[in-house]
């Protein structure tokens, strides 16, 4: 029964793997709920900052900001690539990378140079393999990323844009649609498009600004951009946990099917061995 022992060894190995994938599925399910709550909680803040900023810009048309300036021609662009730090999340990162590299190729075909800021280990590794110009990165952000870890890398791109070194900034991430569906998203971060600066007026009054409108505008623009990036990161993390939960469930189910097939093969091999032994015993008895 050497073959039978090998099959039993395979069964135990697959069972051990199944325990791991089932545990990862349960952990991802728990984390997914938390990341979804964090994602939903971040939206009202970003929307309120955008509303106040838009109201300020419309009420004070003379206000300007380097991050709001539009360029006539784009010679150099920056792309923020949001990805996961870990794998085992299905095709989540692959789909985002396809969107990212597609945009990079589109820009390069137009003669536009590209700088990259990576948020997540997988994206950083992919950009480095492609030998892109990575100007900033933040990895190992954890399950509850802090804004402090993002400010440094984002400041690099924002400063480049304000100083005229970059003419546009984009962000690529995985948008959370539902548990079973996550889509790669590409958005223009800078310059702010007109729909970002539009707000419906239901009143004719204006805010009182302390210390003054330009200082407040400087604060709001940066906070708005940071909140948009944080929202994208929160959506990407929710997508990551959902994709990992689905992937681990599929792996657990596949392991169960493999175990059933191996047990069937083992039972057939055992039955054949018993039949052979009985035949040998009967043949020996007949010979006597």
From Swiss-Prot:
Pfam families (UniProt xref): ATP-synt (PF00231)
- Record-given protein name: ATP synthase gamma chain
The free-text function statement in the UniProt record for this protein reads: Produces ATP from ADP in the presence of a proton gradient across the membrane. The gamma chain is believed to be important in regulating ATPase activity and the flow of protons through the CF(0) complex.
Task: Name the SUPFAM superfamilies for this protein.
Answer: ATP synthase (F1-ATPase), gamma subunit
Example GO BP: proton motive force-driven plasma membrane ATP synthesis
- In which domain of life is the source organism classified? Bacteria
Its membrane topology is listed as: Peripheral membrane protein
Q: Which organism is it from?
A: Chromobacterium violaceum (strain ATCC 12472 / DSM 30191 / JCM 1249 / CCUG 213 / NBRC 12614 / NCIMB 9131 / NCTC 9757 / MK)
Q: Mention one GO molecular function.
A: ATP binding
Protein location: Cell inner membrane
Which keywords does this Swiss-Prot/TrEMBL entry list? Answer: ATP synthesis, Cell inner membrane, Cell membrane, CF(1), Hydrogen ion transport, Ion transport, Membrane, Transport
For this protein, the record's PANTHER family field holds: ATP SYNTHASE GAMMA CHAIN, ATP SYNTHASE SUBUNIT GAMMA, MITOCHONDRIAL
To which protein family does this belong? Belongs to the ATPase gamma chain family.
Indicate the quaternary assembly. F-type ATPases have 2 components, CF(1) - the catalytic core - and CF(0) - the membrane proton channel. CF(1) has five subunits: alpha(3), beta(3), gamma(1), delta(1), epsilon(1). CF(0) has three main subunits: a, b and c.
Q: Which InterPro entries match?
A: ATP_synth_F1_ATPase_gsu, ATP_synth_F1_gsu, ATP_synth_F1_gsu_CS
Gene Ontology terms: cellular component: plasma membrane; proton-transporting ATP synthase complex
């Amino acid at each position: 029964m050497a073959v039978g022992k090998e099959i039993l060894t395979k069964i135990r190995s697959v069972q051990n793997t199944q325990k791991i994938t089932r545990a990862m599925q349960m952990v991802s399910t728990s984390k997914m709920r938390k990341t979804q709550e964090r994602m939903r909680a971040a939206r009202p803040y970003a929307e309120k900052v955008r509303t106040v900023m838009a109201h300020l810009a419309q009420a004070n048309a003379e206000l300007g900001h380097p991050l709001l300036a539009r360029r006539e021609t784009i010679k150099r662009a920056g792309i923020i690539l949001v990805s996961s730090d870990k794998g085992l999340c299905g095709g989540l990162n692959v789909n985002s990378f396809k969107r990212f590299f597609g945009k990079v190729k589109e820009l390069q075909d137009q003669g536009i140079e590209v700088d990259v800021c990576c948020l997540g280990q997988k994206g950083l590794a992919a950009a480095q393999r492609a030998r892109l110009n990575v100007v900033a990165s933040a990895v190992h952000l954890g399950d509850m990323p802090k804004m402090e870890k993002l400010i440094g890398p984002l400041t690099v791109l924002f400063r480049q844009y304000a100083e005229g070194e970059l003419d546009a900034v984009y962000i690529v991430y995985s948008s959370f649609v539902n548990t079973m569906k996550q889509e790669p998203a590409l958005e223009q971060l800078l310059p702010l498009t007109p729909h970002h600066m539009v707000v419906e007026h239901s009143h004719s009054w204006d805010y009182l600004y302390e210390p003054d409108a330009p200082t407040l505008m400087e604060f709001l623009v940066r906070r708005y951009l940071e909140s948009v990036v944080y929202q994208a990161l929160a959506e990407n993390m929710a997508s990551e946990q959902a994709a990992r939960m689905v992937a681990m469930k599929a792996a657990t189910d596949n392991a169960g099917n493999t175990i059933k097939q191996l047990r069937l093969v083992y039972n057939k091999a055992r039955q054949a061995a018993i039949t052979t032994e009985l035949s040998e015993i009967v043949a020996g008895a007949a010979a006597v």
